Amino acid sequence: RETGVEISSFIVVYRWSGPTEEQRKMAVENWKKMIEIAVDMNVPVINTEFSGDPNQQEICNGMWFRSMEELLPIIEKEGLRVEVQSHPYDFCELNNEACDLVKSFRSPNLGYVYSSPHGFFYDEGKGDVRSMLKYAGDELTHVLFADTFNQTLDCRYIANPPWLNQRGKSDVTIHQHLAMGEGDVDFDGIFE
């Protein structure tokens, strides 16, 4: 404060979607402390992710709602805005479903972040940024810019060893953040 420098936002990632109740409760306590810190430091925005486990979507979805029901009244009371993005390997990776989760609370204190390097996860490899941003509508509060390759196309990324998961299936997500223009993201569509 003495220097005049202000912080525009924090970014935190807690396991508020579980998949275990112990993880969720611990995350909610961490969230409460982070909210206190944001208020004390006059930081109006906290960016975050859904977290959870894509292999336990139903459980994690319920845990996220339980966490939000506990935290959103505090967030609203303190006048903060929480902006949520879907991240690869979260319980919810799809754009429209993520937007629906945010929209379901009908709160101006809860917004949706579109992260362009995650866009191919958001619509299962189509990369149709125009329709995703249109669907987000008024809940869209923030866009993160970086390029990436479409991970669904053949030979874009190689993950070794092939047995990365003992359950006998691929349980790995791969993406990267590149400079704009170095990958497959439709930036013209974003800027329209």
Positions of predicted regions on the chain:
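Short amphipathic alpha-helices and their capping/turn segments at secondary-structure boundaries
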Residues: 1-3, 31-40, 99-100, 127-141, ...
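Active-site acidic/histidine proton-transfer and metal-coordination neighborhood
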Residues: 3-9, 15-114, 121
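Acidic/histidine-rich catalytic cores of soluble enzymes
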Residues: 10, 69-179, 184
